[in-house]
Amino acid sequence: MSMKSAFRMRNFAKKLLLILFSAFLGLAICEIGLRLLGFKYSGSTWRNDPLLGWSLRPGASAWEVDEGVAWSKINSHGYRDRERAAPKPQGVYRVAVLGDSCTEARQVDRDKGFTSLVEEELNRRHCCGERQVEVLNFGIGGVGTGQELLLLRERVWKFNPDMIVLQFYAGNDVFNNHRALNTSSPDKAPYFLLRNGKLELDESFRQGRAFDPTYIKLKGVSADIMNSSALLQLVYKLSRLYAQRQEMARLSGAGQTVAPSDTDAPPPEYQRYLSYLPPAIPSMVEAWQVTEALIVELNKETSSHHAPLLIMTIPAIHQIQPNPKIQEAYRAKYKIESLEYADDRVERHARANGIPVLRLSKPLVEEARRTGTYMAGFANTPPNSGHLNERGHAVVARELVRAICEIAATRAAAKSLSKN
């Protein structure tokens, strides 16, 4: 190589290093600036899961800023909870709570979620004896009753719970148990089907590379990198906004309107009120039948482990609307006889099978009207929308503590009588 060529190479290398350094410095300044400005974006704590379709990623952490502002830290077992030992230590009484996003409660700080509040109050009251009480949060956003049954069978028992609480949400739990109704993730979850009166598991969702362990790990690493960078979060947020606007423009340009039909897949906008009505389409009939069969199966599962089951119904938003006029207008618009249809049906079915039920719509709406505050919604969302806020979680905790203490007292009395 001639001296002239060598000089050009060194000059090119210097320029390249200068460009790279300038780019790095610019990105670093942007990152620092965004952090100083307090920029946050709701990060991902999810992972693909070959058992459930999806679950929370062990060790992940991220902000939630779409509803409320809260920090989510996932423990080493993959739940939004503090670290728990498996198996259960001696001298501990455990309550395991199965549920969806209402139980996961990423919209509020962990110590303000109802599972943490219940644990604190039960230890203060000592209604479960002198043992230390732990209330384990197994909530995973978006799951249905079938996934909760699988979770209980395969992953919860190793924690040796003494009682199981199944949180049921009328707004979408029935939909999530049927592929045609589960519009958010129809092909990403396992489903139970009723055939000749028996539940059969459909696991066809596992096709493709999405559930390959290496792929899951790489996706988790990329999500962790995204969660740790304000700049990457901003880029992702802008790309999502652009995609959403493109989709809205496409739908607007189509100029189509839809109405309820007797098909198996009603339009998503009508699913908002379908759970308040008796099933009138085949998919809803099937979804309710599967849901009720799953409740029976959950009861069999808990009974075989000598752990009592309590079903706790979290109401949908319109059930806890504090303004009676708004509530009545909604009922009239969609010809709803009772906003309590789903909760009524679940309670009847559960009690017919010897399962106690805790219903929360009445105490939540009474508290909202008594205090003049909403039990759902946050400063960055419309009032009475989305998920329960801290006030709502406090009411849930109060009622759940009462129910658990009643069950514990009944079992203690029965045990005492059996000894005599």
Language model regions located:
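Generic structural signal for small/hydrophobic residues in well-ordered secondary structure
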Residues: E31, D100, E148, I164, ...
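N-terminal secretory targeting modules
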Residues: M1-R94, D109, K158-D162, V174-H178, ...
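Solvent-exposed, acidic/flexible segments
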Residues: V95, Q107-D111, G141, T145, ...
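Membrane/wall-proximal cationic-aromatic binding patches
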Residues: L37-G129, G255-Y270, L364-P383, N420
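Solvent-exposed, polar/charged alpha-helical surfaces in well-ordered, non-transmembrane soluble domains
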Residues: S116, E120, L150, E154, ...
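Histidine-centered active-site loop/cap adjacent to the catalytic His
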Residues: L18, P356, N380-N420
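Serine-dependent acyl-ester chemistry module
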Residues: K112, A170-I355, L360-R370, P382, ...
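Conserved SGNH/GDSL esterase-like catalytic core that processes O-acyl groups on lipids
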Residues: V69-K73, A85, Q90, R94-A96, ...
